[in-house]
Amino acid sequence: MIRWCLHATPCGVLRLGAFGGRLCLCDWADVPARDFVVRRLERGLHVRFAPWPDDGSLSGSGPRGISDTPDPDGSDNPDVSANSGDPDSGESDHADRCVLDCAARQLDEYFAAQRRVFDVPLLTVGTPFQRAVWELLTTIPFGATRSYAWLAAQLGHPRAVRAVAAANRANALSIFIPCHRVVGSNGSLTGYAGGLAAKRLLLGLEHQPLLR
């Protein structure tokens, strides 16, 4: 199962999920259109989501599971791959809880301007092209931005700007995989899963000095 919890941030409530001792989800809990991300994880990992704590004491609604909503990014297919097998449930459950705690703590440090780099182990689930885009996103430095055209060129597909943008939308690990650092070629903010206000806040935060 994928253990999940909700975590409040200045940008809104984030839905965190862990599987196999790695973080597989950090997405915007209040955006219904993001349900396709949850569905992709369930199908790619062949598991379902389960809340943590088990008593449901965390506020808000969790993942809705598989729905009939079509995947807008074309990754809703049996060829979706993942860097994980089926871990032992007991040991994995403890590891997943530790990962969720660590992710929440590092997010708090990030929003408090006390952290610039995350070291939580990540698990991505997507097509080879999507995962190549996400890997490239992790190379964009804190405080910097890149364009969709730059990403496409770096991947060797300069005309695949729309495909790169779609892969950004499909990113299940917001902030940890910093798709908010991607802007239009003219510097415009363009879109963002958490909304433009959240993107503006994140980019503004990353231009503040690091507090010790």
Regions found by a protein language model. Give the residues of each.
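LysM (lysin motif) carbohydrate-binding repeats in extracellular/periplasmic proteins that recognize
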Residues: 158-161, 202
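Gly/Ser/Thr-rich beta-alpha loop segments that engage phosphate groups in nucleotides
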Residues: 14, 128, 145, 158, ...
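…primarily DNA-binding HTH/wHTH and HhH modules…
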Residues: 174, 185-212
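Short, basic, alpha-helical segments at the C-terminal edge of helix-turn-helix-like DNA-binding modules
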Residues: 181-183
